[in-house]
């Protein structure tokens, strides 16, 4: 019964993640949803900037702290190995949903174009960024990344093995294609508001700092010389720079 409960929990966590991920596309793109990055009542500039920074900061702290090996080794003693990743995914998704809900719009225009060719090109780049994100998860192990593999192995009584390091397809061009996809999607828009600009700047800064200061170090410790060799051959974010 406990294993079945963990499976149900993992499926719920993945479903919430999927909803949060799909909503992110509409939220940043300002379409299909009633609450997007530029919708809602515009309030005091200073207070809006502070609230938005706190929302992004909450997500950043949760997302980074819970991903660190030291935290995970303690956390699995509480939630169990099988549901650790699902819990991380669920809490990250809830932090995002809170951000969507409480985000304060700042609609001052930074840039805007009505040139049809430019508009279509920017929407194409926007979609391309999200496609990179999705495809990059498949090039490692999408189901392990979001906790489904762990709950399946627990249900079947399979000993979980650490994933083997591999650098195929997009990972042969940059070391962090998922993050590159997010950055592209966050910046590609035919209409950049002040709120959208702040979102893009702060998320880009977070991605660069989190990857350089934490993720890369954790990967070096976990993988060792093979990852060091990979670092020498493949750039972090910008293709063809090595």
Question: What is each PLM-predicted segment?
Answer:
Residues 148-162:
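Juxtamembrane inter-helical linkers in multi-pass membrane proteins
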Residues 61-78:
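Membrane-helix interface/capping segments
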Residues 1-14, 85:
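Alpha-helical transmembrane segments and their helix-start/interface "positive-inside/aromatic belt" motifs
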Residues 43-57, 118-137:
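Alpha-helical transmembrane segments
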Residues 14-33:
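Alpha-helical transmembrane segments of multi-pass membrane proteins
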Residues 23-26, 46, 55, 132, ...:
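Hydrophobic transmembrane alpha-helices
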